[in-house]
């Protein structure tokens, strides 16, 4: 469920040494499954553990996860990174905003999951996003660009070299191509 690097585990052990005995960490998601989802880590004193918590044992401590957050923390990772600017704890939870779908889910759900969990976070750095409009009988994923991608001069490259390549690699037997149906209008909102 959650991977915690050796450096992060050592950091937690050091922090927990100054806490009352039996204190662990709690990893949680506020507003899981929504665009506003936020992840966090806090201390979990012994009297704060709930009966339905999932306990994940690590070296010298446990990570407690509440039942509601658990499915949204699949594939989550915590690391402790040190660089010339200092050190920081990083928590990555790719499924926090949208629950991971099973491999046998309908194609539309699996593509929508990839769009929301992998593609849109990349496009968000430019203020953009895409939406799946439909999948044609010929296996073409019809997409609509929004935000900073609408009217961007790089949209064709993003579509063909980025999104289409990624989706065809992931769904080689189910998709035959990707098509953009956006009526692009370059304006102040456009990234480039």
Curated annotation (Swiss-Prot):
Assembly information from the UniProt record: Homodimer.
Molecular function GO labels: 4 iron, 4 sulfur cluster binding; iron ion binding
Tell me, in a sentence or two, what this protein's role is. Answer: Involved in iron-sulfur cluster biogenesis. Binds a 4Fe-4S cluster, can transfer this cluster to apoproteins, and thereby intervenes in the maturation of Fe/S proteins. Could also act as a scaffold/chaperone for damaged Fe/S proteins.
Please provide the record's keywords in A-Z order. Answer: 4Fe-4S, Iron, Iron-sulfur, Metal-binding
Gene name, please?
A: nfuA
Organism, by scientific name, is Shewanella frigidimarina (strain NCIMB 400)
What cofactor requirement does the entry state? Answer: [4Fe-4S] cluster
Q: How is the cofactor bound?
A: Binds 1 [4Fe-4S] cluster per subunit. The cluster is presumably bound at the interface of two monomers.
Q: Which SUPFAM superfamilies match?
A: Fe-S cluster assembly (FSCA) domain-like (SSF117916), HesB-like domain (SSF89360)
Q: Which HAMAP family match?
A: Fe_S_biogen_NfuA
Question: Which parts of the sequence bind [4Fe-4S] cluster?
Answer: 149, 152
Q: Which family does it belong to?
A: Belongs to the NfuA family.
Q: Give the protein's recorded name.
A: Fe/S biogenesis protein NfuA
- Quote the PANTHER family the UniProt record gives: FE_S BIOGENESIS PROTEIN NFUA, IRON-SULFUR CLUSTER SCAFFOLD PROTEIN NFU-RELATED
Per the record, the GO terms for biological process are: iron-sulfur cluster assembly; protein maturation
Q: Which domain of life is it from?
A: Bacteria
């Amino acid at each position: 469920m959650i991977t915690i690097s050796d450096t992060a585990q050592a950091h937690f052990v050091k922090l927990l040494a100054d806490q009352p005995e039996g204190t662990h960490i709690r990893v949680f998601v506020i507003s899981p499954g929504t665009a506003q989802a936020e992840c966090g880590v806090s201390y979990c004193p012994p009297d704060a553990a709930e009966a339905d918590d999932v306990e994940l044992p690590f070296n010298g401590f446990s990570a407690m996860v509440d039942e509601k957050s658990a499915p949204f923390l699949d594939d989550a990772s915590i690391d402790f990174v040190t660089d010339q600017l200092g050190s920081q704890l990083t928590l990555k939870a790719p499924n926090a905003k949208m629950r991971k779908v099973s491999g046998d889910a309908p194609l539309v759900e699996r593509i929508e999951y990839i769009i929301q969990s992998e593609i849109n976070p990349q496009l968000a750095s430019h203020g953009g996003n895409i939406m799946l409009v439909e999948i044609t009988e010929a296996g073409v994923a019809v997409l609509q660009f929004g935000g900073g991608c609408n009217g961007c001069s790089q949209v064709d490259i993003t579509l063909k070299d980025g999104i289409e390549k990624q989706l065809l690699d992931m769904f080689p037997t189910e998709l035959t191509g990707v098509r953009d149906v956006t009526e692009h209008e370059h304006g102040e909102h456009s990234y480039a």
